[in-house]
């Protein structure tokens, strides 16, 4: 075996493993990934973990290299990149004639202009509608409930 294949065990890890044996923790096989979800959408991911279970089966000890994945910040970064013009174009059907296209644009514009947004930014409503496929009314209600927080609104609409 090459030196790079041999795993170095630290003194602290060695003591921890001895203590786990004394407590009766048994190794659990066939676990390839451990994901722990924390508040605010933060995920702690351990790839190739060593997992030990207590005899009661309710407590686990996980060894391995971990990484953090913040879903909320990724979603928040993606939301400003959304282009409202692309959203409106995607929502409209393909025109069969130029005249029909102009008429449908006027109808959509009138419908959007006549809708009561209740103090919510129409662009925010369009972005959330695109991400969640929810109705305009539901999006406005959710944005009001979340105090115009786009990320919270998207998460609430997609989890319900």
Curated annotation (Swiss-Prot):
Residues 120-159 form the UBA domain. Residues 10-75 form the NAC-A/B domain. It comes from the Eukaryota. GO terms for molecular function: unfolded protein binding. One of its GO terms (cellular component) is nucleus. Its main location: cytoplasm. It is found in: Cytoplasm; Nucleus. InterPro entries: EGD2/NACA0like (IPR016641), NAC-like_UBA (IPR044034), NAC_A/B_dom_sf (IPR038187), Nas_poly-pep-assoc_cplx_dom (IPR002715). GO terms for biological process: protein targeting to membrane; protein transport. It holds the Pfam family UBA_HYPK. PANTHER family: NASCENT POLYPEPTIDE ASSOCIATED COMPLEX ALPHA SUBUNIT-RELATED (PTHR21713). Part of the nascent polypeptide-associated complex (NAC), consisting of nacA and nacB. Component of the nascent polypeptide-associated complex (NAC), a dynamic component of the ribosomal exit tunnel, protecting the emerging polypeptides from interaction with other cytoplasmic proteins to ensure appropriate nascent protein targeting. The NAC complex also promotes mitochondrial protein import by enhancing productive ribosome interactions with the outer mitochondrial membrane and blocks the inappropriate interaction of ribosomes translating non-secretory nascent polypeptides with translocation sites in the membrane of the endoplasmic reticulum. Belongs to the NAC-alpha family. This is Nascent polypeptide-associated complex subunit alpha.
């Amino acid at each position: 075996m090459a030196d790079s294949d041999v795993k170095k065990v630290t003194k602290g890890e060695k003591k921890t493993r001895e203590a786990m044996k004394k407590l009766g923790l048994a190794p659990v096989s066939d676990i390839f990934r451990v994901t722990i979800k924390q508040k605010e959408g933060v995920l702690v991911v351990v790839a190739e973990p060593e997992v030990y279970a207590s005899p009661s089966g309710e407590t686990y000890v996980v060894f391995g290299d971990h990484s953090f994945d913040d879903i909320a910040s990724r979603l928040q970064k993606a939301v400003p990149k959304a282009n409202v013009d692309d959203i409106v174009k995607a929502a409209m059907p393909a025109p069969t004639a130029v005249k029909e296209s102009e008429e449908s644009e006027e109808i959509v514009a009138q419908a959007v202009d006549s809708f009561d947004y209740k103090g919510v930014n129409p662009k925010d409503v369009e972005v959330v509608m695109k991400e969640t496929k929810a109705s305009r009314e539901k999006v406005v209600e959710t944005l009001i409930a979340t105090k115009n927080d786009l990320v919270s609104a998207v998460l609430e609409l997609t989890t319900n």
